UniProtKB/Swiss-Prot annotation:
Gene Ontology cellular component list: cytosol
Keywords of the record: ATP-binding, Glycerol metabolism, Kinase, Nucleotide-binding, Transferase
UniProt protein name: Glycerol kinase 2
Organism, as annotated: Streptomyces avermitilis (strain ATCC 31267 / DSM 46492 / JCM 5070 / NBRC 14893 / NCIMB 12804 / NRRL 8165 / MA-4680)
Regulation: Inhibited by fructose 1,6-bisphosphate (FBP).
UniProt family annotation: Belongs to the FGGY kinase family.
A biological-process GO annotation: glycerol catabolic process
Classification via Gene3D superfamilies: 3.30.420.40
Protein's job: Key enzyme in the regulation of glycerol uptake and metabolism. Catalyzes the phosphorylation of glycerol to yield sn-glycerol 3-phosphate.
InterPro entries named in the record: ATPase_NBD, Carb_kinase_FGGY, Carb_kinase_FGGY_CS, FGGY_C, FGGY_N, Glycerol_kin
Residues annotated for ATP binding in this entry: T16, T17, S18, T270, G314, Q318, G415
Entry EC no(s): 2.7.1.30
Residues where sn-glycerol 3-phosphate binds: T16, R86, E87, Y138, D248
Amino acid sequence: MPDNAQKYVAAIDQGTTSSRCIIFDHGGAIVAVDQREHRQIFPKPGWVEHDATEIWSKVQAVVAGAIAKAGLRADQLSALGITNQRETTVLWDRATGKPVHNAIVWQDTRTSALCHELGGSDGQDRFREQTGLPLASYFSGPKAAWLLDNVPGLRARAERGEIAFGTIDSWLIWNLTGGTDGGRHVTDVTNAGRTMLMNLETLQWDRSILSAMNVPEAVLPEIRSSSEVYGTAVGQLSGVPVASALGDQQAAVFGQACYDVGTAKNTYGTGSFLLLNTGNRPVPSKNGLLTTMGYKIGGEAPVYCLEGSIAITGALVQWFRDQLGIIRTADEIETLAASVDDNGGAYIVPAFSGLFAPYWRSDARGVVTGLTRYVTKAHLARAVLEATSWQTREVVDAMYQDSGVRITTLKVDGGMTKNNLLMQHQADVLGVPVIRPRVSETTCLGAAYAAGLATGVWNDLDELKSHWQKDVEWTPSMEASERDREYHNWRKAVEKSFGWHEEDGVN
């Protein structure tokens, strides 16, 4: 039974494939979890959409499910936090509360031609100084512009103030706090920073970019901090303060207690996202990284990060399993790889659809190099795992070149952190300890922490740091000479992946 004196915080994690609600206690331990998937809609090649109404319905269901599993009443929740898939874009009718079109998902590439046109002679760098981002189809601003130009009559309605724009956090907060009956139309700095419409210095919408993209200011939410009470929930959560919003990767930074300059976390999923806390000033990147918001606590100074995104890490293990059939389950790769001492001279560069950070080479394609008759499937299994470690090393090196900050440890989360061989190799190639926390749900935990800070459940960042607990630590054991030799070979393999795909027109 729940402790009546205990304080509980709920967090909604609205992700690309599913929505979850996790309830945490005051110690940061998980009390209950509920999760539901939603549909992926693919109207055309390269197009990916979600039904925002379905997402809201699933979010309501997982909140109810988590509360029921915890044996709690809604009035026992001290706060509600939100974390979300970043960049996914919703436009809705303020009067009816209904979306005017399916949400355009971050993976969707329909705005590639529009981005190419917007870039003009400056190319991808046109808005980088103001936003920290390259002009690319991932980000929300071009998605909103596309909707305004392609849904009949929408632009005129938007200019009259009838339409609301938001990333998923805004859509959820608006609905949670009343929707058409007084719902709050807000976003936080981490999500606004991924629209390519917010100025990183002022933390306000940049009117010159709005003008260039032809997005009317009337549709935009108010930009707020990541940790403050935006409003009070109605409905099943009636009276609960809605008190945080963070993009998913920034929420993981917060949940991993990366509050000091130089602290970093890497989330290992289908791909990987490595974020480094660079403090209260944005650090521009000359090495293929994104300059992004980390978080902002109430009226305190904002914290910025450098972000390196790696397209293929866990997905390479899936390919090894599903396309090659060498293993039957993802977990088998560790046993197979551990049966040999090294990669036998083989390297696999998983540039299946190009390389992300730090190269951003859309012409790259996957290669296997260094093959001899000595190489076995076990060596290839090891090369699959090592590809993740080496790609992470390249991002860490780029972060040092941009910021001058050397990481001293790397905090890790995500499914691949269960693989001890991979985590040991990661520590070896970075030359620093790699640490996995006891609570693995760092994204939800970060949203809960930020909401609890805003409502007095926790007092300050020092208290949150004291809750963070280590589960496993891997320390480097590789000689520097071996590390340097292997890294040199990896870099040679990467060069072999360039120039394979010749594009017709705009990618």
